[in-house]
Amino acid sequence: MADSRDDLAESLQNLFTSVSSMVKSELQGTNNHLDLLEKMNLRVASEYDDMGDVAAGLRVFAEQMKSKSGGLDEFVGQMDAIEKQVSEFEAVISVLDRYVSVLESKIRAEYRHPHHQRRSNDSVVTD
């Protein structure tokens, strides 16, 4: 009976050792997973930090563009005023061009068909 108790004790010892090894392996696997998750979290946190830096840079860039845009608005207003003046000048030039064309036509007509005679004292007499 002592032998069977020794065998039983040895079997139980082997069982406990095996269960202990299995639990230890499971815990080591879980620990490895946790280490991997920690490394992944650190990597993701680093990526988010980089994205935050990029976003901050973009915000500064957008603010600079907005301030430059405000300066450009003044020039755009000046360009609009100049464009309006140019349009007004073009309208005046068009009126003057038509007036000059009418005068040229009258002068050509006068040279082709003179209606006036000149006296010796340069006064004009009409027919």
From Swiss-Prot:
Pfam families: BLOC1_2 (PF10046). The keyword Cytoplasm applies. Its main location: cytoplasm. It is found in: Cytoplasm; Endosome. The keyword Cytoplasm applies. GO terms for cellular component: BLOC-1 complex; endosome. Keywords: Cytoplasm, Endosome. Component of the biogenesis of lysosome-related organelles complex-1 (BLOC-1). Interacts with BLOS1 and SNX1. Component of the biogenesis of lysosome-related organelles complex-1 (BLOC-1), a complex that mediates the vacuolar degradative transport via the intracellular vesicle trafficking from the endosome to the vacuole. Belongs to the BLOC1S2 family. This is Biogenesis of lysosome-related organelles complex 1 subunit 2.
